[in-house]
Amino acid sequence: MRPEIVDSFVEEYNLHGPKLTLDSVSTRIHISKKTIYRFFRSKDDIYSFILADMKEEFAGKREAILSNHQLSCGEKIEGILTVKTQWEERLDFKKVHLLALDSPVVFEEAVAIVDAACSNIKKELEKGIEEGAFLSSIHVDLTIGCLRSAILYLLQTPILDQDNMGYDEAMKSLAQTLLHGIAR
């Protein structure tokens, strides 16, 4: 029943964003709200369940990228930034900025996923500088701070919706900008 509740929750989220109700979730799959509460304490608990799964999937995919010795530091950074989980396919990321307002505690869980990725990228950036793949003049903490801010900007503002851009497209653009700059 848990997967059905999550599936219904995702469908309602994609229609209504964070303003969805557990009533609409229960109606969608023809169960009582009481049944939902047997599996989840609240709407935020369902978000947390999804984010925990996303975090685990990201961690596994990041580890696979980082342990692939055939990839350069730049390719690893690009891989970390553009890796996709099932949730990018299933969730409408254009509505995520509303979650920051509606459920700030849950949003902080999403920020933790961003921070874990930035930590891995920082290590690869430092390694790339050491190996001569990146300019030695790069200020690592500033670069990571800019990257983190850019990712959070995507998640906290309606930019994806305003520019009619998918999250994966935005992350590819960020990766290209970070690794290749904006000059022609």
Where are the language model's segments positioned?
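Short secondary-structure transition hinges
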Residues: T85-K122
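Amphipathic, non-transmembrane alpha-helical scaffold segments
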Residues: L51, K55, F107-C118, I144, ...
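Short, basic, alpha-helical segments at the C-terminal edge of helix-turn-helix-like DNA-binding modules
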Residues: L22, A52-A59
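C-terminal peripheral helix-coil segments that are non-catalytic and often amphipathic
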Residues: E75, G79, Q86, S119, ...
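Secondary-structure edge/capping motif, primarily at the C-terminal ends of alpha-helices
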Residues: I65, H69, K95-L101, L154, ...
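Hydrophobic alpha-helical connector segments
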Residues: E63-R90, I144-L147
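Helix-turn-helix
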Residues: E4, S8, E12-D45, F49
